[in-house]
């Protein structure tokens, strides 16, 4: 009989697989994980408290730095909350630009996840392909707003800049190219026996457990729960587009992988439709006072980000700054199930499970 001894092992706070400052204290017995304790807060910047002393427009750049892989959806959620409280009607052209920006951002975010997750478990080539395509998306967004990562593009009432000449055509050309690349991704990885063995049956949880942990996004849909805010509680102009909500079956790492890959395809459908229906003329900004004062009251809105359900709560006293601002950050909630998933697993599966949850530490810590 082999004698083993329990020992504590620190993963992070600076470890390549965490893609940020995140510490995981694991208790192992041989190669089996007995207990896992996440330690967060290394990237906490007090965004919500800072916002209490900022005007509403000044808050937008701070949202870029929460989920910095999906800054457009973060920009939108704060604008959407303020617009809801003010009862603003957004110009149609602005709404189309918002949707195009958010869905391009969703594609770019999932490409980063695909490439880095596979790199973490030993596949180098997909990382290079993913960042090749992501660079094309980032260049499109750069042309639109002059930034590559932290965009600060959306405004209360619309967007800062109209699309430059020829931009919509470039978006149209990108869609068929990306669809073709996705087929190559599946040929390279999804049908690879080694990869399938690394993810099938790993990190399983049920739909009931997902709901009890308040999971959202692909982490919820992988269990078979068909819930997407864009479809079930449409905001902006999402009700004008035809797209599906991909779901999994058993809630393992394979289902999470396939859900996100399918989500890229659905985002491309939305982008294609939005580019075809894009209004030929019109304003990109509603008439909004330079100094925004939100009526007294409170509101909560939620939208679908690449990581899941991001929400924004605002309490206003009728001033130019919020009395209280609170974000529901999906990565923070999705992370909570990690200790349960890791308990009893082989240590070799740790990186696979962590990568499948797809957290962004700027969003976890806030």
UniProtKB/Swiss-Prot annotation:
GO terms for molecular function: NAD binding; NADH:ubiquinone reductase (non-electrogenic) activity; quinone binding. It is found in: Cell membrane. It is an enzyme of class 7 (translocase). It is a peripheral membrane protein. Its EC number is 7.1.1.-. Pfam families: Complex1_49kDa (PF00346). InterPro entries: NADH_Q_OxRdtase_suD, NDH1_su_D/H, NiFe-Hase_large. It catalyses: a quinone + NADH + 5 H(+)(in) = a quinol + NAD(+) + 4 H(+)(out). This is NADH-quinone oxidoreductase subunit D. It comes from Bacillus cytotoxicus (strain DSM 22905 / CIP 110041 / 391-98 / NVH 391-98).
